[in-house]
């Protein structure tokens, strides 16, 4: 029977190796939005301890096309009735987050959020751009699923590993509050993307990540966890960029990502003691991948990398501060509501 320490060490190595391999493959294959594939691979490696069967992988690709394609249905409404369209997007985000926290598939919920925000925002400006984003997401998912399968084949869980204990179910009232909070976190980035979807697409991905992280964050720790993980991700992206500048090639890109991934994976799986939840380290690594991926693309396009990074990091911080404010205000409102209605079911702070 393998020890818990051995299982965690194997999973940390698998997460770091898979994420690094997917990042290098995504840029090596010149995918249209290269940071999407490693983000999906990171999410799947952190969420699943078993590889997806072949049929399930194809089914997931079909689900991605259907769920992201749902954003295309909102484009005419956003064109002709923008206020109604925005409110409908907000309602759909609430329902999707509620579905994800009620026991639904977390990957499907993520794809639906992306479809409602990225696809509809891109299509509101240019329908062809929305189709390109869908194609990019499908390609990124296929690459991520392939890399995840290779990672599980190279580094499977030790024989005899016990399945994880199921998380306790939340009450319906608590799920609704958490879903409302997550939807309000995502909405400002969606409104920004309606202005210029090509420029604000990374902000949408960051806000989706924050929305998911906010469901496991309390008002007491919101600033430390949400803002702290964003700042740590930005700092790691800067260190990664200068380290990569020493030897600029795809092989070193993979090795540096492997090193950074191992450092954070040790924290994520509790191999190195710390005071932060796994979501903090996962959000930090996701933020680093988004910022780093955009910087590499800016450099390849001949843009001013440092100015673009400063602007993007500033927007990330603003979005994170807004998320912290939403967590704090909604938690305070919920506490006042429970205090004024003592017969209502009490719930711990979100």
Residue map of PLM features:
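Alpha-helical transmembrane segments and their membrane-interface boundaries
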Residues: 1-108, 121-258, 266-350
């Amino acid at each position: 029977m393998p020890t818990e320490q051995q299982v965690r060490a194997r999973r940390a190595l698998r997460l770091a190796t898979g994420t690094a391999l997917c990042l290098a493959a995504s840029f090596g294959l010149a995918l249209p939005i290269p940071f999407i594939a490693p983000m999906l691979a990171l999410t799947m490696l952190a969420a699943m301890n078993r590889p997806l069967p072949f049929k399930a992988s194809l089914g997931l690709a079909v689900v991605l096309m259907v769920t992201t394609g749902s954003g295309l249905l909102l484009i005419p409404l956003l064109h002709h009735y923008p206020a109604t369209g925005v409110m409908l997007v907000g309602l759909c985000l609430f329902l999707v987050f509620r579905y994800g926290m009620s026991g639904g598939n977390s990957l499907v919920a993520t794809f639906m959020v992306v479809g409602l925000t990225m696809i509809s925002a891109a299509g509101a400006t240019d329908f062809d751009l929305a189709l390109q984003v869908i194609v990019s997401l499908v390609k990124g998912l296929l690459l991520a699923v392939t890399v995840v399968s290779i990672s599980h084949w190279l580094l499977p869980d030790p024989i005899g590993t016990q399945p994880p204990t199921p998380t306790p179910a939340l009450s319906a009232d608590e799920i609704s509050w958490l879903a409302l909070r997550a939807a309000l976190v995502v909405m400002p980035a969606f409104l920004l993307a309606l202005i210029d979807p090509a420029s604000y697409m990374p902000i949408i991905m960051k806000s989706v990540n924050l929305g998911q992280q906010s469901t496991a964050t309390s008002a007491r720790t919101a600033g430390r966890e949400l803002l702290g993980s964003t700042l740590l991700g930005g700092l790691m992206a800067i260190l990664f960029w200068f380290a990569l500048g020493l030897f600029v090639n795809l092989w070193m890109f993979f090795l540096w990502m492997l090193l950074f991934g191992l450092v954070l994976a040790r924290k994520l799986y509790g191999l190195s003691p710390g005071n932060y939840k796994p979501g903090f380290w996962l959000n930090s690594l996701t933020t680093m991948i988004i910022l780093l991926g955009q910087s590499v693309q800016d450099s390849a396009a001949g843009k001013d990398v440092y100015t673009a990074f400063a602007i993007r990091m500033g927007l990330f911080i603003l979005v994170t501060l807004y998320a912290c404010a939403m967590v704090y205000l909604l938690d305070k409102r919920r506490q006042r509501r429970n205090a004024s209605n003592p017969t209502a079911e009490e719930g711990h702070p979100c």
